[in-house]
């Protein structure tokens, strides 16, 4: 999944308009114009399409955490320079205040069965012997399950 796909999916799941999206970026200390946001949200084959880079997506996810959980006291965390699916999944879990069992249920809503041990392997340090890279399929199914839960209730 591309960063733009993730941004589009989260926007759809939460039914956010442009103003809300721009305020989420702003809460994480990144000013984004409506024009810039529009370019990130366009289909990949559109001539005006622009790639959303890792620090920009990390800033959005930090802003989403601020929006959903409240802004932390003190300085805003610096956005990661490089994102992995593992980090994205972790940030989404924090934003939506999800525990491991909640994530497993969301994956089941998307017809994907993952054990608790497999899930915990995604959140280990990369140099840990049981670390496992989160594949795009897992992230895609997590977002699908989140969509079923939040849009169909």
Language model segments and positions:
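A short secondary-structure junction motif
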Residues: 67-71, 126, 149
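A cross-kingdom feature marking solvent-exposed beta-strand/loop segments within repeated
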Residues: 1-8, 16-52, 74, 112-136
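Short, structured motif recognition centered on aromatic/hydrophobic residues
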Residues: 6-11, 18-25, 54-64, 88-93, ...
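Short, solvent-exposed interaction modules
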Residues: 62-113
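Short, Lys/Arg-rich amphipathic alpha-helical interaction segments
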Residues: 131, 135-153
